Each structure stands twice: as C-alpha cells, then as structure tokens.
Amino acid sequence: MSLSRWISVLVLVISTVPVLMAQAPQLPPSQSGPASVATKAQPANPDFAQAQRLLQQGKYDEAISQLHQLASQNVKLPGVSRELGAAYYKKGDYQKAAEYLKPAIQEDPKDGEAVQLLGLSYYLGGHPTDAIPYLERVDTWLPRANVDASYILGICYIQTKDYPKARKAFARMFDVPPDSAASYLFTARMLLRQEFQPIAEEYAQKAVTLDPKLPLTHFLLGELYLFKSKIPEAITEFQKELSLNPGHAATYYKLADAYSRVQKFDDAERLLQRSIWLDATSTGPYILMGKVLDKKGETELAVRALQRALAMDPNNPVTHHLLGQAYRELGRNEDAERELKIGGQLQQRQDQKE
C-alpha cells in the first residue's frame, strides 16, 4: 500500500470516532491518487510471500508466527523487522509494531513506509510526542495537495499542546496563510473536536478579530457557548452568523436548539422549518422539531417529525426513545413499548462499542 493511502485509511478510521459535537463537519480521507514520495521501493521478497498472504486474509497471528520463525532461522534476514512491524500494525498492536519498525528504519533509513508506520504506531498507541518527528518527515514527502498527513500531524501538535505548529499544519492542509483568519478558524474547529474548548474559543475569537465577516466563525463560537450552556451568548453568535451567512441550514438548527433551551418553542419551530427547507437530509432538525412540538402539546405532529427522522436513520436510539414517549402520551402503549425497547437495545449496543 502506498504512503498516501496508509494515511488516508487512518483518517477514515479517525473520522468515525465519536466527537464532542455531533454536527461538527467530518474530514473525509483524501481521494487523490497515490502520492509521489521520496521513498525507496521495497522489492518483493519470496521469503515473506506466505506471511503476506496470511495478512491479506486477516490471519495476523499466523503471519506473525511465521515471520518470527523466519527470523529465528536467519537473524540477519533483510526486511524481517519491517515485515513484523507492518504485521503488528495491521493487527492493531501498535507497541509491538513500533518495537520492530525502529530497527527496520535503522536498517534502511530511506524506507518511507516504515518511517510512516512508526509515526502512526506511536500516534495510535497514544504517544504523539514520539510520533511527531516521523510524521514531520512524512509530511515533507507528500505533495501539497495531500491533506491527510497534515491533518494527523496537526492533531499530534494539539495533543502535545503545540498550538502554533498545529495551526501551521492545518493552514497547509487547507492551503491558506498560517496567520490568516481562516487558519485560526480551521484550528479552532479541530481543537473543538479534540475537546480543547478554551483554546478553541481563543482561536475562534482571534479569527473574528482578524476577519469579523468570515463565514462560520460566529457559528463555531455559538456552538461553543451552547455546549457551555451560555445560551444568551450562543444566541447572539448564531444571529451574527445568520446576518453574514443566511443560507446556512445548520445555523438555523443550532439557533433553534438555543431557543428551545429557554422555552421559546414558537421561535424554535420557525427556525427549524427554515433549516429543513434549506437541507432536508439532516436528521437533527427533525428530531429537535419532534421535541419542540411535543413541548407545545402538538404530539401528533411531533410523531410525524420523529417518524421522518427514523426513516432517515433507523439506528438512532434517541429518536426511538422520543417516539416511544410521544406514543405513550397518545395512549398508543403497544407502539410506545416497542419503540422504547428498540431505543434501549440500540443504546446498549452503542455503549458496548464505546
């Protein structure tokens, strides 16, 4: 697998991890082709062919056992440390992967994939400080168009609290000047995803200072304040965003959420209608509409909204739970018990995965 595709797969995995705010945009993996990198091609070694076939079949332990056997038969067998490191990486044993990839790099410092896998092993093993030097090398090999290496490196900088370098990495990722308002905005969003709320707020405020009319900056601040239950401040920021960006469906949704928390249900309903008119593909506004209509005593309409959300995403436990409550209010006890049971089962599965 090429250097860029290893990183793309990792970003795809990262993007599926639950984040602080469900509506935060998710970064997709790069769709560009394999990058040209300053790496030394690894010739196929027939000694490793069987182990590689086992790895492709997902038989990691068997492959690793065979590689260890080869190593014991010939302690000087070239490339065996690299193969063991890659095998442990695929298995998800990142500590052992790093243990074997380090001597592999000493054996061949120009092996770009081994350098990359060592950096990723440290990162995924929870050692971002150790990962950074190797990921920095990878970042210099990849072309400017490939954003994935910059993303992973930026996250490592955040985790080690080196925020200026994180900002530079994300600036490169989005191809904007590192001192621009956009750079601060992008970094604030990434900080929020990593649950660094105070620094995220600081960077978002800096973005506003540099460019008060930059779209989505006030939206991000509104999300921050909403999360911190600073409802008046959140409402103010969302209103500012709408004055600059009146076609942004998510801002209507978030502003409606803020109004619902202070029991301004008519205002919330009106804003949710606008959000749905602009974007009928998101379940969040339909779910919140169900809650708002139920609070207004319009339970039958609430059921319709929740049924629509359920048709779009049948595996959301919250929707099943709210629908069960609404059915119970209407006296539809059998339907209520069914939905509450399904919601409980789905929630249990989610908790087990976490």
Q: What spans do the regions from the language model cover?
A:
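Alpha-helical segment of the N-proximal tetratricopeptide repeat
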Residues: 43-76, 86, 90, 155, ...
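Helix-start (N-cap) detector for alpha-helical repeat units in TPR-like alpha-solenoids
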Residues: 44, 78-79, 112-113, 145-148, ...
